[in-house]
Structures are given as structure tokens and as C-alpha cells.
């Protein structure tokens, strides 16, 4: 019988645009933990560093709750990047005008999974 165990981690209101983080998340979805960390470490993007922290946190949660689990047995089940809070600022322009500057944040949700066979 195959039993799935899932462990999660969330990063809320992280200072990066979701539009820039989603392509990075697509690169690691479905990969093993070791490969995902290798891919994220090699990327120079700010979003990759944020995603790396959340993935490491999810793997750490998994290894904390299941002592028999190793890094090789973990893979990335799901990565979700959603819009976070937006900070709007006024940007003064010429001739007394003003533009709005929107700073976007994102929420990152990572779910890791481990599979093991149970006989009986």
C-alpha cells in the first residue's frame, strides 16, 4: 500500500512581484528536493532566494515530523505563488502631477511529499 505524507511551508508578504516569482516556481515543481535546491542556488534572481528559503523550511518541517526521512526521499509536490499586499506610494512628477507607484508582494506556498511502501 502506498501512503502519501505531505508537509507544507508558507512565506507571506515576501517583497517580490508574483509575476517574477512564478516562472521560477514552475522550474522546481515536481523535482526532488536536492535538485530543486541546486536549481535555486544557481539562479541570480531575488525570487529564487525567497523561494529557496520556503522550500528549505518545508523540507525541514518534513524531517522534523518524520525522523526517518532524509533529503533524498523528499520531492516538491506543489508550489503556489499568489498576490500579497500591495503598497501604494505617490511619486511626484513635473508640473504638480503625481503618479502612483505600486510595490507588489507575494505569498509562496510550498508542499513537499514523501512516499513510502507499507507492507501488510
Swiss-Prot record:
Task: Tell me which NCBIfam families the record gives.
Answer: rplV_bact
Query: Which terms under GO biological process does the entry name?
Result: translation
* Primary role: This protein binds specifically to 23S rRNA; its binding is stimulated by other ribosomal proteins, e.g. L4, L17, and L20. It is important during the early stages of 50S assembly. It makes multiple contacts with different domains of the 23S rRNA in the assembled 50S subunit and ribosome.
- Return the GO cellular component terms, semicolon-separated: cytosolic large ribosomal subunit
**Native source organism of the sequence:** Borreliella afzelii (strain PKo) (Borrelia afzelii)
UniProt GO molecular function? rRNA binding; structural constituent of ribosome
Specify the protein name.
Large ribosomal subunit protein uL22
Subunit comment: Part of the 50S ribosomal subunit.
- The answer to whether the entry has keyword Ribosomal protein is yes
Record-linked CDD domains: Ribosomal_L22
- Coiled-coil parts of chain: none
Enumerate the Pfam families for this protein. Answer: Ribosomal_L22
**Keywords annotated in UniProt:** Ribonucleoprotein, Ribosomal protein, RNA-binding, rRNA-binding
Q: Which domain of life is it from?
A: Bacteria
The family database entries (PROSITE patterns) matched by this protein are listed as: RIBOSOMAL_L22
Q: What family does the database annotate?
A: Belongs to the universal ribosomal protein uL22 family.
